UniProtKB/Swiss-Prot annotation:
GO terms for molecular function: ATP binding; ATP hydrolysis activity; ATP-dependent protein folding chaperone; unfolded protein binding. PANTHER family: HEAT SHOCK PROTEIN 70KDA. Belongs to the heat shock protein 70 family. GO terms for biological process: iron-sulfur cluster assembly. Keywords: ATP-binding, Chaperone, Nucleotide-binding. Chaperone involved in the maturation of iron-sulfur cluster-containing proteins. Has a low intrinsic ATPase activity which is markedly stimulated by HscB. Involved in the maturation of IscU. Pfam families: HSP70 (PF00012). InterPro entries: ATPase_NBD, Heat_shock_70_CS, HSP70_C_sf, HSP70_peptide-bd_sf, Hsp_70_fam, ISC_FeS_clus_asmbl_HscA. SUPFAM superfamilies: Actin-like ATPase domain, Heat shock protein 70kD (HSP70), C-terminal subdomain, Heat shock protein 70kD (HSP70), peptide-binding domain. This is Chaperone protein HscA.
Amino acid sequence: MVFLKNKVKKKLILGIDFGTTYSLLASVQNERVVLLTDDKKRYLLPSIVNFNKKKPLIGWEAEKKIIKDPINTITSVKRLIGRSIDFIKKEFPILPYVIEDNKDGGILFHTNSGLVTPIDVTSEILKFLKEKSCEFFNKKIDATVITVPAYFDNLQRDSIKKAAISAKINLIRLLNEPTSAAVAYGLQLNTEGLVVVYDLGGGTFDISVLKLNKGIFEVLGTAGHANLGGDDFDTLLSKYIYKKLNLSNQCDNFFQSLLLKKAKEIKIKLTKYEKVEVNFFNWKGIIFRDEFNLIIKDLIQKTLFICSNLLKEIDLKIESIKEVIMVGGSTRVPLVYQEVKKFFRKSPLISINPDQVVAIGAAIQSDMLMKNTIQKRTILLDVTPLSLGIEVMGGFVEKIIFRNTPIPISKTKEFTTAKDNQTIIVIHILQGERELVKDCISLSRFILKDIPSKKAGVVRILVTFEIDTDGLISVKILEKFSHKEKKIQIENVTFLQNKNIHKIIKESTINAKEDYYLRVRKEKKIESKYILDLLNNALQEDRNLITSEELKKIKSHQIKLQKSIDEDDFFSMKLNLKKLEEVSKNFLSLRLKKNMDSFSIKNLSDEIT
């Protein structure tokens, strides 16, 4: 239990660890965190729903149906929520369910209860958890914090929120799982310094580096893999067993479910014993822990590779890390503990049950948000996992909020029009680390119409990005002259590409140099074209301000610059642009003086009249 200095109980709060495999409930009661259990004293609730022609079965009752009714029994929905059908078919080619594309985004499950979405499935689980909590305390729950992986994207987070609303839960915050674990340990240990949270659950892996200082939890960086966890251990082990069975035919849904269940049982036993006797269909034998270690070693190394990349990215040496916290049921696997200990060169903390620590942190944070506790509130500074920006001329991405920026955050940048008399602006919102639009994730597009018709560069557009404490994004655009404004919340975007975030960051690092030079070259080309257009327009209006000799020189250098543009010769373009600016200096100076004189005469005329 985690003890808190709290004398007055004001409201009944709840922390929900919504897990891929299991979910947990916790609440602060009488100065301590209490983990809620069922009538059989089990604190783990399987995140499973069985849809039948009557009332859906949830949890342990639903788990009994996995083998008998795999098509209607939805497991690990957390891996599917907020995902497109293309992503799911690619990442999970063998699923026991019948699914189809949902026109509103995501997928639909075909069940005995009809078509249901991952949000519906999640809502049933959350509703069940809420009901069990009300029964446990015999009163209504006032507020709830739900935890999510740090690498859940905007669509996934929004889907969890919608599921909570559907379950009639008063959700006061979505809390990143690694941060939640740090809340639990931070309050218990009262430590200060750099802490790594290694979170390996059933379906996701996250690593977060946090700086703890006087009640402030600042997330310095996060990384992870949205599809790497204990479920993958089970899958690899089931394939290993399948080979031993020597079966020629492909397994059906029923056999596949049975095989996965057996693999999971063996995995759990191997966390305690060096060997396990197996009697499955036509095969009897022994599986040793060493065999299992060989099967899963590459996956564990993959998590450590992600850890290594994050430490390099935030320029942190292993020696400066004070503590390593282990979170998630999959960290019970002995090899995981051994490899993490070896990598970080220190024994990870496991004094709080890895299964329970996230729920404990959620309960503590929920209690503090509702101001039930008299102690100083902990300040959580989470970060955004990927940079956000908009498309600008040339197919570039202008980043407005950068990766690993603490949230909540609001940031504004000023832009202008690219063409004369432009009355419409299309804002294309993007997420990612690359320089070009084609290499980033498209989140949304929206249009601001009827802006003042003026010359290019005159109109001023303010673009504001906001990310709230739950990591949800909103974008506002304001045209300063007419005060026209438009704001959108990035929600269920059906064309959102659910790429693996670790892959995006890795690709941006590999291509950083090439992307930089490509952008510099393209920007120089755009600048050169822009200068040529401006100069041509100016000469049409005021060529009488200069001698024919000066005009000839300018025209000559214009031709040279145009040739450099056509040949896409960067260095020639750079040189010729500089020379054109030099020979045009006198003309532009005379033109500016003329315009200033005209402006003064007009003002004087206005005063006289």
